[in-house]
Amino acid sequence: MEWEGLSVMLDAGACGVSRAPRSCLWVDGPVAGDLLCPLGMHGQSKKLSDLLNEARIPARDRASVPIVRTGPRGVIVWVAGVRADERARCTQSTRLLLELSLVRPD
């Protein structure tokens, strides 16, 4: 699958990111049992495996889908190219925006 060029705007505070040095997120792949609250589902949780299936990501490509988390084994904030988590969405109370983009390394 081609993931380059995809981006999302999230609430930095909800993602645990601030302007402080060393404030960061974690990117890895899907882990068995992963859950998230997909944007648009009003806080209802869903298995990541079901979300990837519904997005028609071929089974052979699912292990390479970038998963952005709050930390190692942390809460999922973005399934890159598929869906953001409801808990990380921007709201009227959002004070700091976080734009995440996928780019190909040189």
Residue ranges of each PLM-predicted region?
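Basic, glycine-rich polyanion-binding accessory segments appended to enzymes
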Residues: 1-106
